[in-house]
Amino acid sequence: MFGKLLTKVFGSRNDRTLKAFGKVVNKINGFEEEYGQLSDEELKAKTKVFRERLEAGETLDDVLPEAFATVREASKRVFEMRHFDVQLIGGMILDSNRIAEMRTGEGKTLTATLPAYLNGLTGKGVHVITVNDYLAGRDAENNRPLFEFLGLSVGINVAGLGQVEKKAAYDADITYGTNNEFGFDYLRDNMAFSPAERVQRPLHYALIDEVDSILIDEARTPLIISGAAEDSSELYTKINTLIPNLIQQEKEDTEEEIGEGDYSIDEKAKQVHMTERGQEKVEVLLTERGMLAEGDSLYSAANISLLHHVNAALRAHTLFEKDVDYIVQDNEVIIVDEHTGRTMPGRRWSEGLHQAVEAKEGVHIQNENQTLASITFQNFFRQYEKLAGMTGTADTEAFEFQHIYGLDTVVVPTNRPMVRQDNPDLVYLTAEEKYAAIVKDIVGCRERGQPVLVGTVSIEQSELLHSLLKKEKIPHEILNAKFHEREADIVAQAGRTGAVTVATNMAGRGTDIVLGGNWNMEIEALANPTDEQRAKIKADWQIRHDEVVDAGGLHILGTERHESRRIDNQLRGRSGRQGDAGSSRFYLSMEDSLMRIFASDRVSSMMKKLGMEEGEAIEHPWVSRAIENAQRKVEARNFDIRKQLLEFDDVANDQRQVVYAQRNELMDAESIKDTITNIQTDVINELMDQYIPPQSVEELWDVAGLEQRLQQEYTMVLPIQEWLDKEDDLHEETLRERIVDTWINAYKAKEEMVGEQVLRQFEKAVMLQTLDGLWKEHLSAMDHLRQGIHLRGYAQKNPKQEYKRESFELFQQMLESLKHDVISILSKVQVQAQSDVEEMEERRRQEDAKIRRDYQHAAAEAIVGAEESAALAATQPQVREGEKVGRNDPCPCGSGKKYKQCHGKLS
């Protein structure tokens, strides 16, 4: 109550922000008349003046009013479009590390030109980030004339560009591209072997379009560069044949009654679990096929990999649906983005799930992958010095933007009042009744000439509706992941009189639906349109536009509520752009997944109380509230998943920053001779401490062990025992100095023989390749650790603290291994000439060429509640073949340490 009263008196935080920016808008408007009288050359010269002022010590805020006024005037001349005052406010929000919520049709693309130009003046680079290559290319080409008029260069960063083209794109003042490409380039730069191979400059300013899609929907998906691991396609095919023999259990087991099924599904958590009966049945089937020894258990340590394959196949068959979660195209399984309905070529599910789905669909099974480098979008974007974003729907996620990224959300008022009519939801008992009502609504709209956009949550739904409309002989266009080639054309004409367009989630489509159809596209379709043709097209469009407005504008029809209110708002936001007429309504049924999983009991009881009969719809605020509460529950759960993923990735991120910084230092250094000398001294001291403990008596020295280790690992044949026998005054400290001197002198002799330049180059190559190899193994170990860490909760330990502690131990072990491996290689390898180093480099390049880029999709579920798969992944490294190694035996890795002090630490 008091909060509302204070807001009434002082205004909300949003109002106060808008008021402050409103004062700057008045300053910008004050320059309009003066700048309107400048010649083109005088206006272009402003860029040089602003840059000189910035170099002289002025800030971007100092030049902002004049810079924005310059862009507005240039836009009037180049595009014949003038920035509205609300767009100027949007530009200021984006320049001040905030998120601007701007409704559809309010000109986000034009708004972005203001902060992009202002920050482009610094010469440090501006990255304008969109969700797909089409939008990146379109926005770059559309805005290029404006930026080039003002003397700024524009680059496009999309998939498939070569290194030279990428470097040129990044060197431009303003670079348009997709989040995937910027992220991949960051990882690739940190796998480069020379400064010349890097393409990115330091990350300065990122301006993200559809920011909620990239920073929230994509946040559960780590970005991964991977290389192919071993081929196990035959095993996936064999395991796939078992699953159709299993039966789903309808009810959960209770103390009184044990169910009949082989597996149970938890739809909420998207998990499937084998029952005891199912486990026994699978063991029998595996034994019959000769894949499991008679009497052996699927859960024994030696069969963990087999259990992992069975679980992956079970998930593929029970949780992942064709034309909902993925499509099959050109003998490949392609994931469909649940948020946008777009296909995501090149993106693959992790933990063998993608291979299991490929086996289920009978397509070519690709090899499993090994992670070479990875980062989450959250940690990638947090590295930018300045970060801002814009979207039509950010307010529902404002808390997450602030909590994770430190970005405030400001809602920008519309240029014209919103007049769209949002009707309450209609809820039916069955899906059949719901679809009958939807078709009836579409028929009504067509009769009065009102265009309809029908939003579905899956390809399967859009095709069901397609068949129903065909049956009723209603002409319509369908837009989903299978028919996306004509996307821009279909969306552009979706506002024509009586048009019916069925589309999967419309998020991020990027093309405005103009009432009466898009006349610009009609003109562009003509080769050389005359003025008469242009005038006729525009006049015809005006008639159609008025007809559509009289019919009620664009009608949005949702066939189901999405898990996120934001996606529903994005669909609604397609109508009512720039004060246009419009309406919207969602049709639901008790069989919809959201209702069935999260809201069924409460809503069903309400329906009974309200005396609902078959074929009737319910329209009541109680029901709408219950549905909204169900959506809030899902949003909260998804936020927790993203937050947990970030907390775990923050640990890896600290290590990633250390490794990448070290790598870049190595690469930029002309010589790492001093580093190698320091490592050599460290390695010798560690060996000495191990075999000749400090301040110990000679009887405790293991001289023979030290001589053997030096010879085996470092090809150093030193007569240490002979020295000790001959020289009485040789004690531990002087012996240590002699070994160091002998070692360094031997290395100097190698340098004289090979040549200093060749050896320096070789040292750098060895150091980088060894670091990359160990980092790759470390990432794999971290994955296994993370997937099983939740089990520590059963031992009354905090999984996050345990993960931090153990990952730090793994990291220390990696750094120790790096020192020993580098010195071992440099000691053993005989470099004859420059050609040897070049050959090594060439081999490395060939291996790099084989690396394929992949996404690991929905990996976060392994952290949150994936009991079985996480347990399997955690125990996988412990599978052993052959004899058991005793804790006090020498470690099989050849380090010379006891097993318990080396790789036994990980057991």
From Swiss-Prot:
<feature type="binding site">
    <location>
        <position position="893"/>
    </location>
    <ligand>
        <name>Zn(2+)</name>
    </ligand>
</feature>
<dbReference type="InterPro" id="IPR011130">
    <property type="entry name" value="SecA_preprotein_X-link_dom"/>
</dbReference>
<keyword id="KW-0997">Cell inner membrane</keyword>
<dbReference type="Pfam" id="PF01043">
    <property type="entry name" value="SecA_PP_bind"/>
</dbReference>
<feature type="binding site">
    <location>
        <position position="87"/>
    </location>
    <ligand>
        <name>ATP</name>
    </ligand>
</feature>
<keyword id="KW-0653">Protein transport</keyword>
<dbReference type="InterPro" id="IPR036670">
    <property type="entry name" value="SecA_X-link_sf"/>
</dbReference>
<feature type="region of interest" description="Disordered">
    <location>
        <begin position="870"/>
        <end position="897"/>
    </location>
</feature>
<dbReference type="GO" id="GO:0031522">
    <property type="term" value="C:cell envelope Sec protein transport complex"/>
</dbReference>
<feature type="binding site">
    <location>
        <position position="902"/>
    </location>
    <ligand>
        <name>Zn(2+)</name>
    </ligand>
</feature>
<dbReference type="InterPro" id="IPR004027">
    <property type="entry name" value="SEC_C_motif"/>
</dbReference>
<keyword id="KW-0472">Membrane</keyword>
<dbReference type="InterPro" id="IPR027417">
    <property type="entry name" value="P-loop_NTPase"/>
</dbReference>
<dbReference type="GO" id="GO:0017038">
    <property type="term" value="P:protein import"/>
</dbReference>
<dbReference type="GO" id="GO:0006605">
    <property type="term" value="P:protein targeting"/>
</dbReference>
<dbReference type="GO" id="GO:0005524">
    <property type="term" value="F:ATP binding"/>
</dbReference>
<keyword id="KW-0963">Cytoplasm</keyword>
<dbReference type="GO" id="GO:0043952">
    <property type="term" value="P:protein transport by the Sec complex"/>
</dbReference>
<dbReference type="InterPro" id="IPR011115">
    <property type="entry name" value="SecA_DEAD"/>
</dbReference>
<dbReference type="GO" id="GO:0008564">
    <property type="term" value="F:protein-exporting ATPase activity"/>
</dbReference>
<feature type="binding site">
    <location>
        <position position="891"/>
    </location>
    <ligand>
        <name>Zn(2+)</name>
    </ligand>
</feature>
<dbReference type="InterPro" id="IPR044722">
    <property type="entry name" value="SecA_SF2_C"/>
</dbReference>
<keyword id="KW-0479">Metal-binding</keyword>
<feature type="binding site">
    <location>
        <begin position="105"/>
        <end position="109"/>
    </location>
    <ligand>
        <name>ATP</name>
    </ligand>
</feature>
<dbReference type="Pfam" id="PF07516">
    <property type="entry name" value="SecA_SW"/>
</dbReference>
<keyword id="KW-1278">Translocase</keyword>
<comment type="subunit">
    <text>Monomer and homodimer. Part of the essential Sec protein translocation apparatus which comprises SecA, SecYEG and auxiliary proteins SecDF-YajC and YidC.</text>
</comment>
<dbReference type="GO" id="GO:0005886">
    <property type="term" value="C:plasma membrane"/>
</dbReference>
<keyword id="KW-0862">Zinc</keyword>
<dbReference type="InterPro" id="IPR011116">
    <property type="entry name" value="SecA_Wing/Scaffold"/>
</dbReference>
<comment type="similarity">
    <text>Belongs to the SecA family.</text>
</comment>
<dbReference type="GO" id="GO:0046872">
    <property type="term" value="F:metal ion binding"/>
</dbReference>
<comment type="function">
    <text>Part of the Sec protein translocase complex. Interacts with the SecYEG preprotein conducting channel. Has a central role in coupling the hydrolysis of ATP to the transfer of proteins into and across the cell membrane, serving both as a receptor for the preprotein-SecB complex and as an ATP-driven molecular motor driving the stepwise translocation of polypeptide chains across the membrane.</text>
</comment>
<feature type="binding site">
    <location>
        <position position="903"/>
    </location>
    <ligand>
        <name>Zn(2+)</name>
    </ligand>
</feature>
<dbReference type="InterPro" id="IPR014001">
    <property type="entry name" value="Helicase_ATP-bd"/>
</dbReference>
<keyword id="KW-0813">Transport</keyword>
<keyword id="KW-1003">Cell membrane</keyword>
<dbReference type="GO" id="GO:0065002">
    <property type="term" value="P:intracellular protein transmembrane transport"/>
</dbReference>
<dbReference type="Pfam" id="PF07517">
    <property type="entry name" value="SecA_DEAD"/>
</dbReference>
<keyword id="KW-0067">ATP-binding</keyword>
<keyword id="KW-0811">Translocation</keyword>
<dbReference type="Pfam" id="PF21090">
    <property type="entry name" value="P-loop_SecA"/>
</dbReference>
